[in-house]
Amino acid sequence: SITKSDLVEVGIPVISYGQVHSKRNTGVKVEEHLLRYVPGYYLESYPNALVNKGDFIFADTSEDYLGVGNCVYIDVADTLFAGYHTIIARSNHNEYGKYFAYLFRSSTWRYQIRKRVNGVKVFSITQKILGSANILIPPKNEQAEIVEYLDDICGRIDSIIANIYKRIDLLHEYRIRLVSDVVTGQIDVRDIVIPEYEYLEEEPDEESDDIESVEEETEEQEE
């Protein structure tokens, strides 16, 4: 199978475990930042790892409970591999594929997967577990309406999130530049007076801590 050591700078796109668990993976489409690459000759070496439009790439392990069931919906017809620690899922029907992408993000569907996984620090997801979950299949016109509605609402939310990430990146850049300018003497801070302020202690938020922990883990996995 394709492993992390097989990755190269330029080649055939591949999505692996780390990208599936990326905090920026919406689960409903292939995005540029999710792609890594393997050599072109892998087309002959690993044909079974190729995915088709309409397929899903699931992570077969998760280091946290919230990540159980994470996947990427393949909404493009490009040549693309499923990489290490992944499971390829294909529909036996002609239903609206993106409807399933949204369904797989729902807590109702994921509950079925989570209650069947095994593990303590690492949870394992198998084809059998995925296949044992029940799914809701409304009429095709209803699937299309559901997708259209969620695309609109989630698209707005994703746009806001993307803008926030951009601002965070700019703040990181500003902090780095500020530190550099101060320590190299480009900014003279000898006569700067820091105004008095009151330090407010925040009550610990367990849910927030869990989310931050998950984000730190997924950042490591994305590499």
Predicted regions located by residue number:
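Low-complexity, Lys/Gly-biased intrinsically disordered segments
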Residues: 1-28, 39-46, 61, 214-219
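A short glycine-rich beta-alpha junction/loop motif
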Residues: 79-86, 117-145
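Short, solvent-exposed loop/turn positions at domain surfaces
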Residues: 1-2, 44-45, 119, 156, ...
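Amphipathic alpha-helical coiled-coil/heptad-repeat segments
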Residues: 137-223
